[in-house]
Amino acid sequence: MVKRKRYRFRQGDVIDVEEFHDGRYGGPGTGRAKRAKPTEEQMRAVNAQNKAKRCRQRMLEYFREGDIFATWTYEVRNRPPDMQAALKDFQKAMRYVRREFKKRGYEVFWIRNIERGTKGAWHIHLVINEIGDTASIITKAWTKGGTWYH
């Protein structure tokens, strides 16, 4: 038997359906298996799936076609030593972005991911709602390197 969960976004315009087994499937007459404690790898996989689901659902709710997906990169001389420093840089830039959005009468919606590239350079992926001149605002906000749009 398959169970379904339905999530409605954007006042019901978008429906996200999640299907999964109900947990009682198996051969006739067999009971459920005893609960086993998941391994660290299994927990990491489940946590990654849950994080991806939350991100997908937030994007369905808060973002539309035409919103901006950008990457903030660092110049070599400005590279942070760790993720905490990169997070501080992001927070400083977002203070400017929030202030500019507020001046124009808009609320800012964003999702970000800070990661280290294959060659060791930190960068920040950012999805942000478009208000007309969002690109110029986020380019001006980021002073540590380049802003790339996808």
Question: For each predicted feature, which ranges?
Answer:
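Positively charged, glycine-rich low-complexity segments
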Residues: 1-122, 129-150
